[in-house]
């Protein structure tokens, strides 16, 4: 018979072994994920005012 509790414990043990192998603690995961997200979204939030100055306004034709 399949025991769900034994399966969950096995998954938890595997995750702990993986985390020990890569020397990652649970409290370091928050710092790691936030730094990765910050690095990924940095180019999107950087304002490039010099490029905005080079743009020409669009001409609108009114009927």
Swiss-Prot record:
Disulfide bond annotation, renumbered to this chain: none
A GO-annotated cellular component: host cell Golgi membrane
UniProt keyword list: Host endoplasmic reticulum, Host Golgi apparatus, Host membrane, Membrane, Virulence
Protein localization: Host endoplasmic reticulum membrane; Host Golgi apparatus membrane
A Pfam family that the UniProt record links to this protein: bCoV_NS6
Keyword Translocase: no
Any further remark recorded for this protein: Bat coronavirus 279/2005 is highly similar to SARS-CoV (SARS-like).
Similarity remark: Belongs to the coronaviruses accessory protein 6 family.
Function: Could be a determinant of virus virulence. Seems to stimulate cellular DNA synthesis in vitro.
The protein, known as: ORF6 protein
Annotated source species: Bat coronavirus 279/2005 (BtCoV)
